[in-house]
Amino acid sequence: MINTEQSHTKHWVTSSLLDIEIDCLGRQAALKLIEDTLNDHQTQPRAQALQIVTMNAEMVYAATQDPALLSLLQQAEVVLPDGIGVVWALERQGVSVERVPGIDLVKALLQKPLKIA
């Protein structure tokens, strides 16, 4: 079931796929969020950490079989649609979302200059 809505705690649109909230951030917005969080940790060492999951269809299926995994996915601060199966499922419900592969995020972050306070 997909419910597209503006999250109460987030400033972007989210959708729900089998009781897992998916963040409809594109690659650039996800990178900015990560960079901002890293910068916050530079200036405020006690700033909140950010748990990011890049979810694929296998993870969705596994979560239907494993309540502990489902709970972890539901508690993550950001869940991005990594796999094309997740993107397809969201689009079948009328939600247009960009695929955001985790490996692409890591590569992009590693190309950024390192700032040490």
Model-derived regions: residue spans:
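N-terminal nucleotide/polyanion-binding subdomain common to many enzyme families
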Residues: 2-99, 103-107
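An alpha-beta-alpha
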Residues: 114-117
